[in-house]
């Protein structure tokens, strides 16, 4: 396992994100604790020592599970990371109430790493509101040893991130959405450079973009597998961010054991991309981007649609539709409780989207496209 000295700690380059744990009966079902525990046990045995959770993951159940799953191990064998959410603060809860609840749910007396969650244009006023006192409270907890290292995760625009870091000079690390697709498309390069110039390491979230970079298009996949038949397509995404000099921890959400095994293999070999491999990856990316892709990561920040649309599921289908125009998409859409045609265009989802996707416009385009897409021919 690869390790790196970060914030004075020896941390595994691979960290486990706990936003997409295996579940029972679909995404909205309860966490499959037996499978999730098996994955954590495997990662612990492989030397992974960084585990990330958050208040909102799995409807508030991720923190409870992670605390329980790690409780079988000595507390000094792993680093536990959690985050301060902005939404409950907007609703009137205090940072103290939230922080104390998180400690209790995780069954710990301190967090090794603690972050402001989802810095963005909407959350900056909440985190910096002097009446709420979020940052002073968390700095006090750090002084008292209940937070060992203080950082932030960001989906903000580059100018917002820079202004925030210019104002506050005490953050020890910054977590960014970083992958080879977003390097240009979502200004990840500019954000990476801002944090690097600030002088602190970058933690990576969405290195495989919610699994989207685990398989590109058949043509793009072939470019990568022909270059190195022994590697998975997903491993290229991890090796890309691993090769960036200021990247520290790289988080991966692992819902299946084979994903964990593949990641451990990648991070045990620790092979950075060569110049030739980077050229091949650029060719594969160009082929992939030539298709119509909506950059959804299935983070579910858009949950709560007034028409009860499962927006990430629909956007996933839209990408499949865009890539193939297969009549079978009709069957997949029919399985949804509510389809793209049910969108009323209110825009509530778009205002929450960290990827700044124009969701109502995509829904309208998808619904219109389905009207002209031939229905599948069924055998008699």
Protein language model features and the residues they cover:
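A general structural detector for well-ordered alpha-helical segments in enzyme core domains, enriched
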Residues: 2, 35, 39, 62-69, ...
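Hydrophobic residues in well-ordered beta-strands that form the structural core
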Residues: 52-53, 82, 204
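Structural motif corresponding to the early beta-alpha repeats
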Residues: 57, 73-92, 96, 117-120
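Structural motif
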Residues: 42, 46, 105-106, 145, ...
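N-terminal binding-site loop/beta-alpha segment at the start of enzyme catalytic domains
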Residues: 1-78, 137, 143
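Short catalytic-loop micro-motif centered on adjacent basic/acidic residues
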Residues: 50-57, 148-152, 175-176, 249-251, ...
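Structured C-terminal cap/extension of enzyme domains
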Residues: 44, 48-49, 68, 190-380
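Glycine/proline-rich, positively charged
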Residues: 24, 89-205, 218-222, 228-229, ...
């Amino acid at each position: 396992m690869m390790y790196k000295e970060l914030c004075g700690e020896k941390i595994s380059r691979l960290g486990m994100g706990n936003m997409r744990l295996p579940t029972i009966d679909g995404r909205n079902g309860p966490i499959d604790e037996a499978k999730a525990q098996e994955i954590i046990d495997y990662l612990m045995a492989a030397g992974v020592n960084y585990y990330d959770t958050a208040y909102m993951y799995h409807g508030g159940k991720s923190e409870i599970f992670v605390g329980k799953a790690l409780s079988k191990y000595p507390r000094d064998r792993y680093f536990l990371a959690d985050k301060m959410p902005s939404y409950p603060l907007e609703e009137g809860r205090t940072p103290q109430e939230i922080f104390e609840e998180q400690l209790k749910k995780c069954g710990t007396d301190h967090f090794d790493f603690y972050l402001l969650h989802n810095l963005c244009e909407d959350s900056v006023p909440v985190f910096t509101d002097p009446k709420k006192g979020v940052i002073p409270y968390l700095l006090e907890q750090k002084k008292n040893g209940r937070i060992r290292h203080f950082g932030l995760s960001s989906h903000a625009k580059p100018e917002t991130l820079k202004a925030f870091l210019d104002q506050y000079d005490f953050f020890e690390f910054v977590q960014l959405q970083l992958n080879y697709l977003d390097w240009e498309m979502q200004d990840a390069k500019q954000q990476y450079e801002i944090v690097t110039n600030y002088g602190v390491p970058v933690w990576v979230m969405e290195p495989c973009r919610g699994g989207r970079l685990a398989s590109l298009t058949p043509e793009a996949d072939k470019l990568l597998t022909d270059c190195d038949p022994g590697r998975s397509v997903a491993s290229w995404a991890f090796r890309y961010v691993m090769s960036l000099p200021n990247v520290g921890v790289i988080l991966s959400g692992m819902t299946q054991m084979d994903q964990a095994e593949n990641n451990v293999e990648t991070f045990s070999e620790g092979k950075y991309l060569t110049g030739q491999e980077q050229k091949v990856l650029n060719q594969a990316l160009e082929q992939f981007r030539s298709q119509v892709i909506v950059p959804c990561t299935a983070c579910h920040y858009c949950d709560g649609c007034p028409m009860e649309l499962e927006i990430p599921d629909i956007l996933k289908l839209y990408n499949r539709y865009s890539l193939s125009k297969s009549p079978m998409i009709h069957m997949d859409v029919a399985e949804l409780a509510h389809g793209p045609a049910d969108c009323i265009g209110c825009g509530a989802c778009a205002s929450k989207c960290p990827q700044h996707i124009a969701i109502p416009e995509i829904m309208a385009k998808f619904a219109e496209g389905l009207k002209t897409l031939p229905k599948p021919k069924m055998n008699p």
